[in-house]
From Swiss-Prot:
UniProt domain comment: Contains a C-terminal catalytic domain, and an N-terminal region which modulates catalytic activity.
Active-site residues per Swiss-Prot or TrEMBL entry: S174, H200, D296
Record family assignment: Belongs to the CheB family.
Location, primary (coarse class): cytoplasm
GO BP annotation list: chemotaxis
PANTHER family found in the cross-reference section: PROTEIN-GLUTAMATE METHYLESTERASE/PROTEIN-GLUTAMINE GLUTAMINASE (PTHR42872), PROTEIN-GLUTAMATE METHYLESTERASE_PROTEIN-GLUTAMINE GLUTAMINASE (PTHR42872:SF6)
Subcellular localization: Cytoplasm
InterPro entries linked to this entry: CheB-like, CheB_C, CheY-like_superfamily, Sig_transdc_resp-reg_Me-estase, Sig_transdc_resp-reg_receiver
Naturally occurring in which organism (per UniProt): Anaeromyxobacter dehalogenans (strain 2CP-C)
One CC-aspect GO term: cytoplasm
Protein name from the UniProt record: Protein-glutamate methylesterase/protein-glutamine glutaminase 4
Domain annotation CheB-type methylesterase: ranges: 162-348
Length: 356
């Protein structure tokens, strides 16, 4: 007798370990994550020592990790995870200067994303939507260390750059982007074209990120404010939770900072920035799309290329997550895909051609 087709297997749920010294945060995360049918919380731990045993016993697919904990700090534990049992890690941090600095250090150490603890400025409802999305994206992306890079060489400024203030470089990134952007800017000279950056990152963390870029690159990097001019040697970073657009104002470019709905599930959105650059700067722009999950920025980069801008993508081998550049390449938005350490020289080469 024919028993008919076997019933389809349910998709495997994402196994998550929550590590936080706050019992309240552990309970909230467990409750909110467990409410999603695609996620299973396989354990919670108050410190890295308890977490270590659970990692070995229960093999989580994703770990949420508080960076400020007793007994062993989250950064030290993150290094151990990446060395001995690489696992996608979402760093959870308080909105404080110390927490922001630690979160950026964690991203540099291999964490795939960062988010804020719920509080007065960040409701549990907002946190839940972000947390579930980040867990699913982290599980899909997996963990992958970027290719090792040589120390950056600061390139010489092409002579043509000094003769123009009309050029602008737009850089968009997500997962792995904080390190990639830092490497690019560290290799650019003080006279490089003005740069606008959209990096997917929560509110307030972008301020710490901009400060880190300033300290590490020597360029005048800061979190953008509406009406600021984009001039050579400056780097304006889109503030978290708000979109950044470029517009022409006479002979110069200025940025607009706007609220509004998320685009491609993100605010700030790379697509929003790239599309505005296409309209405002056209052939005077260079667009760069870097490592990151999803497809934000691909359509906007295509709009830039269609408007005459030069476009570059980070190649697969040097990406932490080859998502955003991959979609951009598939859309025909990219002129050249390059290893991370060749992107800064390419920016200067293209700027020199345009200024010559």
């Amino acid at each position: 007798m024919d028993a008919g087709p076997a019933p389809a297997r349910e998709p495997r749920r994402i196994r998550v370990l929550v590590v936080d010294d706050s019992a309240v945060v552990r309970n909230v995360f467990q409750q909110e994550l467990s409410a999603d049918p695609g996620i299973e919380v396989v354990g919670t731990a108050p410190d890295p020592f308890a977490a270590r045993d659970l990692i070995l016993e229960r093999a989580p697919d994703v770990i949420t990790l508080d960076v400020e904990m007793p007994r062993m700090d989250g950064i030290t534990f993150l290094h151990k995870i990446m060395r001995y049992r690489p696992t996608p890690v979402i760093v959870v941090s308080s909105l404080t200067p110390a927490g922001g600095a630690l979160a950026l250090e964690a991203l540099a150490a291999g964490a795939c994303d960062v988010m804020c603890k719920p509080g007065a400025a960040y409701s549990v409802g907002e946190m839940t939507a972000d947390l579930v999305e980040k867990v699913k994206e982290a599980a899909a992306a997996g963990v992958r260390a970027p290719a090792p890079l040589p120390p950056p060489d600061r390139a010489a400024t092409p002579r043509a750059l000094a003769r123009t203030t009309l050029q602008v470089v737009a850089i968009g990134a997500s997962t792995g982007g904080t390190v990639a952007i830092e490497r690019i800017l560290a290799a650019l000279p003080p006279g490089a074209p003005g740069i606008v950056v959209t990096q997917h990152m929560p509110e307030l963390f972008t301020r710490y990120f901009a400060n880190r870029l300033r300290d590490r690159s020597g360029l005048d990097a800061r979190e953008a404010q509406g009406g600021e001019s984009v001039v050579p040697g400056t780097v304006l970073v889109a503030p978290g939770s708000r979109h950044m657009l470029l517009r022409r104002s006479g002979a110069r470019y200025v940025v607009e900072i706007k609220d509004g709905p998320r685009v491609n599930r993100h605010r700030p959105s790379v697509d929003v920035m790239f599309r505005s650059v296409a309209r405002a700067a056209g052939p005077n722009a260079i667009g760069v799309i870097l490592t990151g999950m999803g497809g934000d920025g691909a359509q906007g980069l295509r709009a830039m290329r269609d408007a005459g801008a030069r476009t570059v993508a980070q190649d697969e081998a040097s990406c932490v997550v080859y998502g955003m550049p991959k979609v951009a390449v598939e859309l025909g938005a990219v002129e050249r895909s390059l290893p991370l350490d060749r992107i800064a020289p390419e920016i200067l080469r293209l700027a020199g051609e345009a200024g010559g």
